Amino acid sequence: MNKKLLSLVLVAALAMSLLAGCGSKEEPKTTTAAAADTTAAAADNETEAPADTTAAAGDETTAAAAGGNTTGETIRVGYAQVGHESDWRTANTKNYQDVFSADNGYELSFVDCDNDNAAQLEAVRGFIQQELDYIVIAPIETAGWDTVLQEAQDAGIPVIIADREIDAPDTLYDAWVGTNTKNEGITAANWLAEYLDGKEANILVIEGSVGASATLGRTEGFNEVAAEHSEWKILDSQSGDFTQAGGQEVMESFIKSYEGQFNVVVCQNDNEAYGAMDAMKAANITYGVDGDVIIISFDATHDGLQYTLDGAINCNVECNPIQAGVVEEVIQAMAAGSDYEKTTLVNDEAFVAPGITSEYATTMTEDILAGRAY
Ligand code: GYE
């Protein structure tokens, strides 16, 4: 069993499938209060798949995952991946390649869709044509899925939506595995309110890719809390496409328009934060715990946490890319004809720079960084 996966905390949702015979009758499971909060927040978010989840804390569980294919026959899985825009994405891809390996009894058809919706639809149609056994999709955007999902269903191929969410009715896919990005946005804003303790915030937001549920969720969650703070002002919010180059470009243009007017930069992933830091450095703007500008980031990848440990990023909200083991567990249950969870949330936490203590986040240490493999 994969060690990393053992450390995942899952919230398993009740969400019974409308499809006869699909879904689990098990109680939802959670290990921490934070995980229960995650579920409750998801239930508030209309655009998200976990809206079906029921917040009920119960038994403890860890992700029993990456156990390998026990059916005795090779299982052919297609994975339509978003692209390779970020360190998070690279880690997610590697995790799928490790879990769905030939040694584990799988044949993985992996397509890097390079953030192109049309390419992603084409990839899924290719999987249908090849009559693969299971299709996994990390959807670039929330919209536009109904037709192709209907095609997969007509072909009798089970579909698992992973990482991000879609707008389609949940009768059109079989399971969903991912993180609650709205809750990540709420955590970031709650931490900021705690840190500022009533002081003014003039905020610039570097959003992720347009139309991605990770962008929509983080924005919605952050804005919901921001709306309760009359002392906060969001000066501007632009997409940096989840890339370092995008983050740098947006930050350079923000500096031109708002130099001297902002004290908070929210980057919706670590790579954007790296680009934003480069742009601020070049403009002699100081940031981090000893600087003039507070930086908030998302993902908490190894390098992002290194910057957090160094005090350059004040707060980094985790998003766990290690999800393939959970997807494999669902596929193994489907193959065995057993019950499985229709919706599985992979839990996230948040980290803050040394010297900061928070009710919403863990203070970074060398040990935490040493334990972060991706
Ligand atoms: O935060 C970002 C990636 O969908 C949660 O996509 C994922 C996001 C992640 O490119 O780095």
Model region roles, listed by residue range:
Residues A64-A66, E73-I75, I206, V210-A214, ...:
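Hinge/cleft segment of the Venus flytrap/periplasmic-binding protein
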Residues W145-N183, N202, G208, T301-Y307:
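Flexible loop/hinge segments that line or gate small-molecule binding clefts
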Residues W88-A102, Y106, E184-W191, S213-W232, ...:
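Short, solvent-exposed amphipathic alpha-helices that sit
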Residues I128-Q129, D133, I137-D154, F222, ...:
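Hydrophobic alpha-helical
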Residues L18-A33:
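Bacterial lipoprotein signal-peptidase II cleavage site
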Residues T70-E73, V77, Q120, W176-N202, ...:
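Hydrophobic alpha-helical segments within soluble ligand-binding/sensing domains
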Residues I75-D103, L108-G126, Q130-L132, A138-T142, ...:
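Extracytoplasmic "Venus flytrap"
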Residues F110-D112, A168-W191, V205-I206, S237, ...:
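Short beta-strand elements at the ligand-binding edges of bilobed clamshell
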